[in-house]
Amino acid sequence: MVCALGIEGSANKIGIGIIRDGKVLANVRRTYITPPGEGFLPKETAKHHREAILGLVESSLKEAQLKSSDLDVICYTKGPGMAPPLLVGAIVARTLSLLWNIPLLGVNHCIGHIEMGRLITGAQNPTVLYVSGGNTQVIAYSNKRYRIFGETIDIAVGNCLDRFARIIKLSNDPSPGYNIEQLAKSSNRYIKLPYVVKGMDVSFSGILSYIEDLAEPGKRQNKRKKPQEEEVNNYSQADLCYSLQETIFAMLVEITERAMAHCGSNEVLIVGGVGCNERLQEMMRIMCEERGGKLFATDERYCIDNGLMIAHAGAEMFRSGTRMPFEESYVTQRFRTDEVLVSWRDD
Amino acid sequence: MMPQIANKPNESIIRVPFETPRLAEIAYKVLGVDQEPRRNFVKKTLSLENDVLVVHFQSDQVKSLRTAITSFFECLLLCQDTINQFGDSKKEKLIPESNDNAGTHSSSDSP
């Protein structure tokens, strides 16, 4: 029996989760929301997390009805992510570990998502599509590692969506990706956008620049261009949102299908914040059904960054015998998914 | 590898007293794990003198020194707040804990 407390704060969400043998005891979270047109910066995000984190720890222990002595391990996000917010989680985790004399474990953020997705959905050995504001990877498990078969070669798909939301000044509440999704539902007018799949990899920076020009034609005037008649451009924001989703989600479906074919896999698991998107889930489900496979996805309680996923991944590590010296309890902005030895899986 | 500091660096020594040597040691361990970002060219050395945490900063530039000290204080305050809220010394125990439970993993819940 392993009871784990997890601390997650690698981006603009700060969350604390408590889990015991696969049973969710607490999962509390706070989101740092910036005004429309602005992204969250590391310093301000860390300030928000510092103000919220101790209250969240206390409320999670109350919700779980536990004393500190009931905990077996404290887990925190070691990386990847933004350094100042990561540091907030790490410092609190270290301090609690020493105060309560409880072992400390650093968890990879991506593996937290994967293990939480596997637990909630019951998927055994799926091809994993991990899509969020900071990561875009196609992952499959093999020989004690979560192998990265394909990934973005520049910005994450969620980053592309978030920055486009900034361009058209969409609200960041509850999240820019969610607001793009809602706006896209009111249009079915497709605009042709660059489709940039490179084998198993994808690229989103070109699409972002292209659609930025569509959204704001007057901005960034190309001085070399001869003055032409202004193009007839009656695209609405909904049209742009719809087309952006159709294009980038089709790209994600393609690389996922290619990985399924390579691995002979019959299951797909979508994790990460963009995995909340129902249109992405629908497109992926269509592909899976055509291949005779099955799609697994979770709702926003677990898709979006949360402390519970760190607690669960950490509990799995702890149960399989992983221990971390206190001197190694630093944070790192880059922490590749395949760097972690998956000692808790035997297959 | 620590970056090279010029012969006449800008320096600052900060002494932080704690209630007990144990709390000072906790802060020393918690705050000593992280290295300063390499490109800042700042050297940070932590040491303990009983219940006082001593931090020595050295830097080429005053602005880097100021940034490093500001960041350190943010981390220190968070560590202290955590100790204040969850440490043993808290009289009114919202989360009761006694020394007898330290290190044990007792649980009254049935599996």
UniProtKB/Swiss-Prot annotation, chain A:
One of its GO terms (cellular component) is cytoplasm. It is an enzyme of class 2 (transferase). It comes from Drosophila melanogaster. NCBIfam families: arch_KAE1, gcp_kae1. Its cofactor is a divalent metal cation. GO terms for molecular function: metal ion binding; N(6)-L-threonylcarbamoyladenine synthase activity. This is Probable tRNA N6-adenosine threonylcarbamoyltransferase. Component of the EKC/KEOPS complex; the whole complex dimerizes. Keywords: Acyltransferase, Cytoplasm, Metal-binding, Nucleus, Transferase, tRNA processing. Binds 1 divalent metal cation per subunit. Component of the EKC/KEOPS complex that is required for the formation of a threonylcarbamoyl group on adenosine at position 37 (t(6)A37) in tRNAs that read codons beginning with adenine. The complex is probably involved in the transfer of the threonylcarbamoyl moiety of threonylcarbamoyl-AMP (TC-AMP) to the N6 group of A37. Likely plays a direct catalytic role in this reaction, but requires other protein(s) of the complex to fulfill this activity. Its main location: cytoplasm. InterPro entries: ATPase_NBD (IPR043129), Gcp-like_dom (IPR000905), KAE1/TsaD (IPR017861), Kae1_archaea_euk (IPR034680), Peptidase_M22_CS (IPR017860). It comes from the Eukaryota. CDD domains: ASKHA_NBD_OSGEP_like_euk. Transmembrane segments: none annotated. One of its GO terms (biological process) is tRNA threonylcarbamoyladenosine modification. It holds the Pfam family TsaD. It catalyses: L-threonylcarbamoyladenylate + adenosine(37) in tRNA = N(6)-L-threonylcarbamoyladenosine(37) in tRNA + AMP + H(+). A divalent metal cation binds at H109, H113, Y130, D305.
